[in-house]
Amino acid sequence: MKALSKLKAEEGIWMTDVPVPEVGHNDLLIKIRKTAICGTDVHIYNWDEWSQKTIPVPMVVGHEYVGEVVGIGQEVKGFRIGDRVSGEGHITCGHCRNCRGGRTHLCRNTLGVGVNRPGCFAEYLVLPAFNAFKIPDNISDDLASIFDPFGNAVHTALSFDLVGEDVLVSGAGPIGIMAAAVAKHVGARHVVITDVNEYRLELARKMGIIHTVNVAKENLTDVMANLGMTEGFDVGLEMSGAPPAFRAMLDTMNHGGRIAMLGIPPSDMSIDWTKVIFKGLFIKGIYGREMFETWYKMAALIQSGLDLSPIITHRFSIDEFQKGFDAMRSGQSGKVILSWD
């Protein structure tokens, strides 16, 4: 079967031919319809320091997808041939304390699809049936293919009660924009998103986010004053991993504010910890999606009217995968979809 693989320890992704994976007793065989390119895939393409430490070569990459069940392991129940599915990309052990306690997303033995085991940039994917999620009929293939990053956005945004709250989102990448859209959809009062990339801020506006701030040109505190905010933000969603953005968030949080962090800053990032202590801030780290509460919420948000379609900006056939990676690497894209049909 055709697959996109990391074949060499250098920059690039290559189309290759690999065997169709074998289905285990507890697995599903999924025929891939559409995949989306993640920022993680770009890191792997670029062969940066993280990738060099993490990715075994060769490796079929990719973890954002939708497909059709075409094979079922003999121990699997609850799925039928023809079911349309996406799936949780974190394969958990099932026997650690967190797994047994129902906190599966915190499994210390997690393996990543397309990172530690073969991924979805292929004609077929084998996945434990436990990890598969059936896609409702009224959700399109395009939207289903981005459930993985949408789940990151939902998990981050819904970490705290947002109704009537003022929310700051730092980082207008696709996940940050989707998190801002979720906050607005569920009843936040003012939702402000910051970045230095004007293309991404315009994309946020297309997604219905009114208050977009280019911090290279505008002062965030001036925007807050124009909105009549006198006490700071109640909730911060840090999606950028940029130290200046996190420091600005700490400066503008209200006392008792709550921050969810999905962006990954440099390990040597320094902050003024007195702002955390004396403001009584609560900071929560976010990794992946809650299994599977986040997945049900994703479907419900779309079914209740949340429109994510503007976040998908580019579509290519799988044979044009290089154009897709070029678009993602340019910084001038939202989500990029690759069709395998």
From Swiss-Prot:
* Subunit composition and interactions: Homotetramer.
**Domain of life of the source:** Bacteria
Family the UniProt entry places it in: Belongs to the zinc-containing alcohol dehydrogenase family.
Tell me any Pfam family this protein matches. ADH_zinc_N
Task: Cite the EC number.
Answer: 1.1.1.103
Pathway(s) this gene product operates in, as recorded in its UniProt entry: Amino-acid degradation; L-threonine degradation via oxydo-reductase pathway; glycine from L-threonine: step 1/2
Q: Which residues bind Zn(2+) 1?
A: 38, 63-64
Role: Catalyzes the NAD(+)-dependent oxidation of L-threonine to 2-amino-3-ketobutyrate.
UniProt binding sites for NAD(+) = 175, 195, 200, 262-264, 286-287
Protein name as annotated: L-threonine 3-dehydrogenase
One GO term (biological process): L-threonine catabolic process to glycine
Provide the reaction this enzyme catalyses.
Answer: L-threonine + NAD(+) = (2S)-2-amino-3-oxobutanoate + NADH + H(+)
